């Protein structure tokens, strides 16, 4: 089993400091949404993020990168064989558990709407089956709850190795960062296995794809 953990993901609802901003409220009215139930999205709110959090507008409000990664993970052979579990840990210490049967909407706007519903209801079901669930949980608490043989961290400053050199058939928890720049907010210093798989910067979905595909090869699916 591969547990793919996207840690410190920049996925959040509108922060309290921004709730009364006239521009944000106009955007909410345009979407016919309550301001406090909207997901922060820098694609539309870049200027507002920069206004309230100077220097963070390239990092915060990035549900788009989570969407791309989940499209890859949920459609993978590994997931279709029920050997992948995907978790989104957010900057505010929520954990979203993605059921293997869940398929992401093909439309990005529908994805945003789905996750806005999740933040409001804390669970999304279909025909009695849980597709998505959300709960308060820190990264170390999530790791503690998983049955695994090893925990690995993908990090630009980790030991440079090909995935085939450290991915095995064991049950592995693989942590990748859910942000486009900067470093982990959570304390990951106690994770002994830290690896870098490429000399240059990669997108989080590229890293996720390499890890998933390498695990598929290791267990003989490819």
Swiss-Prot record:
Cystine residue pairs: none
Any single Pfam family the record assigns to this protein: EMG1
Sequence positions that bind S-adenosyl-L-methionine: 177, 182, 197-202
Domain of life: Archaea
Gene3D superfamilies in UniProt: 3.40.1280.10
CDD domains referenced in this protein's UniProt entry, alphabetically: Nep1-like
Enzyme Commission number(s): 2.1.1.-
Feature type site, description Stabilizes Arg-62: 64
Function comment: Methyltransferase involved in ribosomal biogenesis. Specifically catalyzes the N1-methylation of the pseudouridine corresponding to position 914 in M.jannaschii 16S rRNA.
Protein name, per record: Ribosomal RNA small subunit methyltransferase Nep1
Organism name: Thermoplasma volcanium (strain ATCC 51530 / DSM 4299 / JCM 9571 / NBRC 15438 / GSS1)
């Amino acid at each position: 089993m591969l547990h793919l953990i996207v840690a410190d993901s920049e996925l959040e609802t509108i922060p309290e400091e921004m709730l009364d901003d006239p521009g944000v409220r106009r955007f909410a009215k345009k979407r016919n949404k309550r301001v406090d139930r909207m997901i922060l999205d820098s694609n539309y709110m870049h200027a507002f993020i920069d206004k309230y959090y100077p220097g963070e507008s390239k990092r915060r409000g990035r549900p788009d990168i989570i969407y791309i990664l989940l499209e890859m993970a949920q459609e993978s052979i590994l997931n279709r064989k029920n050997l992948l579990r995907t978790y989104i840990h957010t900057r505010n210490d929520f954990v979203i558990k993605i059921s293997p049967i869940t398929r992401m909407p093909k439309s990005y706007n529908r994805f945003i709407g789905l996750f806005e519903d999740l933040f409001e209801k804390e669970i999304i079901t279909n025909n009695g089956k849980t597709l998505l669930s959300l709960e308060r949980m820190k990264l170390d608490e999530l790791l503690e709850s998983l049955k695994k043989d090893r925990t690995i961290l993908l990090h630009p400053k980790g030991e440079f190795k090909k995935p085939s050199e450290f991915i095995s058939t064991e049950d592995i928890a693989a942590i990748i960062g859910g942000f486009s720049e900067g470093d982990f907010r959570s304390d990951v210093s106690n994770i002994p296995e830290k690896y870098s798989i490429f000399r240059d910067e990669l997108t989080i979905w590229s890293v996720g794809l390499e890890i998933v595909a390498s695990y598929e090869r290791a267990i003989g699916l490819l």
